[in-house]
Every structure is written in structure tokens, then in C-alpha cells.
A protein has these predicted regions:
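Non-transmembrane, aqueous-exposed alpha-helical and coiled segments at domain scale
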Residues: 1-170, 174-328
Length: 328
């Protein structure tokens, strides 16, 4: 996952204030809207390249190549900004990491209240993106224990804001990527970092959580486990997939949150920063303990996915394009 700058709309800005950074709530709403519009109409370069690889791979089945070519054709059409990549828009998720040196201005200069909280600002941006870009409203809300109805707004969004310890002076940068991502460029400056995930970050309904004993933690048992779970994914979630596996953790919640971030490439960025002497706040999901990336098992996951024969929907070897395996 690569970070890149995006610029807030004209007239909206974040500014240095004393020893910290003040961000107007309207900025949060504006680039949340920008992020979800972008996610609805454009693929990240990495994904496009993986589709090209499938289409050009001599080992690909005819069906694999057909799917890859059609997805690339759809990407060209969607990039024009009228027809989205997929009408199954799903849950909008926002993850944010807010340094102690950052405050949000939720009222206008005249005292008019824009938003009651950062969460409301993010939610407003999500709602506007789905309404103004003719995206499908696919969120159901309960009317009773057994009955539900469409919210007709694609809200509520899932918004998780984490408090982090960064402080200092300077300005933040905004960024966007596949799931759209943001960070300050200098670890000595306060920053407000964002991760936007459309469709629940992929297909959340394919998430599987298993409580097991240590008997699973040997190569033979673990491989049998993976073969069963990967085959059970099927093709309904529109492969080629990114398959992420996280083993261990202090709680189910920690495991699943680490898993979600693994699918977005968040931990890839963390690993890269660590290698070049940078810093990242691992405590936001891993309790101060770095997830151990297991690259050899990532290769095995891709092999197992290929061996299912499911392919990119209609038979072949390209069920998965990427894999991430972490141990907590």
C-alpha cells in the first residue's frame, strides 16, 4: 500500500495552531466524500497490474483470461465516473488515527455548528458520496429482531477513531490509496491518518474466525486447515482475491482488526517504514507487539488457492492474486 497526497477542496484546509494542528470538520467530510467516490470508480494500480498478469499468464485458463479482460474493460468504463466498478457497494468503513496534537474545529467562524463530532463529519462525507454518485444503498437496519429495511442512505458507516501519541508542530498531509489512506509525512509532526474502505474492505461476509487449540500449530495441521477454509471461499465474492490469514492474538477483536488491516496492506506500509528506520504506531491494533509476517506461508496460501481449481470465477488457477499471513 503506497501513500500519496490528496488536496482538500478549495477553501478547506488544515492549519498549524500553536503546538498542534487544527483540522476543520468540513475537511474531514470533503475528503471522505472524495475517497469513497474514488474507491467506487477506480482500482488501485496494484490490482490493475494483477489483472494484467492473469490475462498475460500462459498458465491461465481460458476462463481466467476472460474474467481478467472483462474486469479490465469494466475498469476503463468505470474510470469515466458514471458507472461504478460494482453496484454491490456494501459497508463504508473509516479507520482514523488521531495524534494528541490534533484538534478538530467542528464549528464555523460565526459559531455555527458544522458537526457534533469527527464521526459525524466522516459520516456526512460518506452519505454525500453515495447519494451524489448514484451508488447503490445496500445497508439494512433492523426494525425488529427478525425484520430489517434498507436505510436508503448506505448509512450508518463504520467509523473507528484511535487516539495516538504523536505531537509537535507542522501540518498534516492527506493521502489516498486502494482503500484510501492518509498520513503525515514527518513522524515529529502531529498527524491525522485515515484509511477508507468501501464494501467493507472487500467481502466481509467471507470472513471466517476459528477458535482452535495449539494442536493446529504445526505445518501439516495448519495446511489442512487452510485447504478447507480457502476452498470454502468459493467464487461469489468475485476473485481474484486478496486472502489474509492472522493467527493468534490477545482476543478475537484484536485478531479480526489485525486481519482487516492486513487485507488493506496497512501492515505492508508498517513493515516498509520499519526497514528504513521510520516509525509506526503498532499499538493501534497489536497491543505494542508487532505482527510477525510469514512470507513463506503467503506463498503456500497462493499455491493452495491455485490448487482449488476455482480460478477467477469459472475454473482455473487464479483464485487469489495476493496473500498476507501474520502471527500475533
Amino acid at each position: 500500500m503506497e501513500f500519496e497526497k490528496i488536496i482538500p477542496a478549495s477553501g478547506l484546509a488544515a492549519e498549524q495552531c500553536g503546538q498542534g494542528l487544527t483540522v476543520d470538520g468540513s475537511v474531514l467530510a470533503a475528503f471522505t466524500e472524495q475517497a469513497f467516490k474514488r474507491l467506487s470508480f477506480t482500482f488501485p494500480q496494484e490490482h490493475l497490474e494483477s489483472l494484467v498478469d492473469v490475462a498475460c499468464d500462459p498458465a491461465s485458463s481460458e476462463n481466467d483470461r476472460l474474467v481478467a479482460v472483462k474486469l479490465l474493460e469494466n475498469a476503463v468504463i468505470a474510470a469515466k465516473g458514471t458507472l461504478p466498478l460494482c453496484q454491490d457497494t456494501g459497508v463504508a468503513q473509516v479507520f482514523a488515527w488521531k495524534d494528541a496534537g490534533v484538534c478538530t474545529a467542528l464549528t464555523a467562524a460565526g459559531g455555527t455548528v458544522h458537526f457534533g463530532s469527527d464521526e459525524e463529519a466522516f459520516t456526512a462525507g460518506v452519505g454525500k458520496a453515495y447519494k451524489e454518485n448514484n451508488l447503490r444503498f445496500s445497508i439494512n437496519i433492523p426494525s425488529s429482531l427478525f425484520d430489517e429495511k434498507n436505510s436508503a442512505t448506505n448509512l450508518p458507516a463504520q467509523v473507528d477513531i484511535f487516539s495516538t501519541n504523536g505531537a509537535g508542530t507542522g501540518t498534516a498531509e492527506y493521502a489516498g490509496s486502494s482503500c484510501s489512506n492518509g498520513t503525515g509525512s514527518d513522524s515529529t509532526e502531529p498527524s491525522y491518518r485515515f484509511l477508507f474502505c468501501a464494501k467493507g474492505g472487500g467481502s466481509s461476509n467471507k470472513t471466517d474466525f476459528t477458535c482452535a487449540t495449539k494442536a493446529l500449530l504445526n505445518p501439516q495441521s495448519f495446511e489442512r486447515f487452510l485447504k478447507t477454509k480457502i476452498a470454502a471461499l468459493g467464487t461469489a465474492a468475485c476473485p481474484p482475491y486478496t486472502i489474509a490469514v492472522v493467527i493468534g492474538g490477545l482476543s478475537p477483536e484484536q485478531n479480526l482488526q489485525t486481519l482487516k488491516l492486513a487485507t488493506t496492506g496497512y501492515w505492508d506500509a508498517a513493515e516498509a517504514l520499519n526497514k528504513i528506520g521510520g516509525s509506526i504506531r503498532w499499538t493501534d491494533t497489536a497491543g505494542g507487539v508487532r505482527p510477525l509476517r510469514c512470507r513463506d506461508w503467503e506463498e503456500r496460501v497462493l499455491q493452495i488457492a491455485a490448487e482449488t481449481g476455482l480460478g477467477a470465477q469459472f475454473g482455473g488457477s487464479h483464485l487469489a492474486a495476493h496473500a498476507r499471513v501474520f502471527r500475533l
